[in-house]
UniProtKB/Swiss-Prot annotation:
Comp. bias regions, Basic and acidic residues: 39-53
GO biological process: FtsZ-dependent cytokinesis
Membrane-spanning intervals of the chain: 104-124
Name of the protein: Cell division protein DivIB
Length: 374
């Protein structure tokens, strides 16, 4: 039960009405006025009862608030700080432990790695144990290993870091080797992958046949017999001619390459770039080295129009003719050349026909020519 301090404050007595005047002095009220007075009385009574109820509610509310004031007046920030600090304390410990574990793991990892590296370089695993070769066809594997200068038993990684140097040693010693790639094979061994140039032709010399590589280089080694399927190059005495020829030859279609049996260097007095290309079908092509790849592309069309084997002249234009015509032209050219070369010089003092090359000394053949001329 809540204690009410002053009942008079809550339940106020209604003020006394002013003394009524005597009935004689007051006029008689009409029915309407009587009803109005009764209505006003009811309104006043209702207002008084309503005010008393509101005052009681306000008093009860104030008493409840007075009991709650000790708790409400406590500093809110202090309570919140105590709660937050208590909640954060376990998290702070966990974070510190995680950092310590991470640092410890990092230190142990670095230390363990350093120990393993030191043990590796001390062990035989850090030394080259074996070298193998693959892809070689023309050069023996042992010769490649020896010329590479790789040393088994020496440091593996030191030699691997200088692998370009060892590859260059191989290519320098063996021109046929196009590329030598040194790579790791297993834990402590090397593998040398070899790529060789193709032998595309043979250079004919007095001592035999020298292989000609696709890059135009001629190997020093010789073979007594010509390899089948490879064209033979003849009369190429100058070293620069074969690389120039190979630059054009490599551009030819494979069908044309397979149809070539021999290429001879045949310069004329006016053209030092001429070659004769002998085909397997019996034809002979006269063409410039610089025009070989361009004009030989039309050879198949020209050969189909020829009735029998002959000559395809591609020096200036492109035309063909049989071998008989060449023999006739060659005979006339030879007779003209011999007449010019055998032209006689007459010595007026001696009265004898002499050859300028013999310094005025007549020969039996010259005497016969002089007599015939007379």
């Amino acid at each position: 039960m809540w204690k009410i301090s002053n009942e008079n404050d809550i339940f106020k007595k209604r003020k006394p009405l002013p003394p009524k005047k005597s009935e004689e002095s007051q006029p008689e009220l009409t029915p309407w006025q009587k009803q109005n007075q009764e209505y006003l009385k009811k309104q006043a009574e209702e207002a008084a009862s309503k005010g008393e109820n509101e005052q009681a509610e306000v008093t009860i509310t104030l008493q409840e608030q007075s009991q709650e004031e000790p708790q409400q007046h406590l500093p809110q920030e202090t309570v919140e700080e105590e709660e937050h600090f208590a909640d954060r304390l376990p998290n702070v410990k966990k974070t510190r432990n995680k950092r310590l574990y991470r640092r410890l793991a990092f230190i142990l990892t670095c230390l363990g790695t350093a120990i393993l590296v030191a043990l590796y370089f001390v062990s035989p695993l850090s030394r080259l144990s074996e070298v193998t070769v693959s892809g070689n066809k023309s050069v023996e594997s042992q010769a490649i290993i020896q010329q590479s200068k790789l040393e088994t038993g020496s440091g593996l990684w030191e030699q691997y870091s200088n692998r370009n140097y060892f590859s260059a040693n191989i290519q320098k010693k063996f021109p046929i080797i196009k590329k030598a790639n040194i790579k790791l094979n297993g834990i402590n061994s090397f593998k040398i992958d070899i790529q060789e140039y193709q032998i595309v032709a043979l250079a004919a010399t007095k001592g035999g046949y020298h292989p000609i590589l696709e890059n135009g280089k001629t190997l020093a080694e010789t073979t007594k017999a010509a390899e089948s399927g490879k064209p033979i190059f003849e009369n190429f005495k100058e070293d620069k001619l074969i690389p120039e020829l190979m630059a054009s030859y490599n551009k030819l279609p494979q069908e044309i390459k397979q149809g070539i049996s021999e290429i001879k260097y045949a310069p004329s007095k006016t053209n030092k770039d001429l070659i004769n290309v002998y085909m397997n079908d019996g034809n002979r092509v006269i063409v410039n080295i610089s025009d070989l790849s361009e004009k030989m592309a039309y050879y198949s069309q020209v050969a189909e129009q020829m009735d029998k084997p002959g000559i395809v002249d591609m020096e200036v234009g492109i035309f063909s003719y049989p071998y008989e015509k060449e023999s006739e032209e060659t005979g006339s050219e030879v007779s003209e050349d011999s007449a010019v070369e055998n032209q006689e010089v007459v010595d007026p003092n001696a009265g004898v026909a002499t050859d300028g090359a013999n310094n005025g000394t007549p020969t039996n053949g010259e005497n016969q020519e002089v007599q015939q001329a007379e």
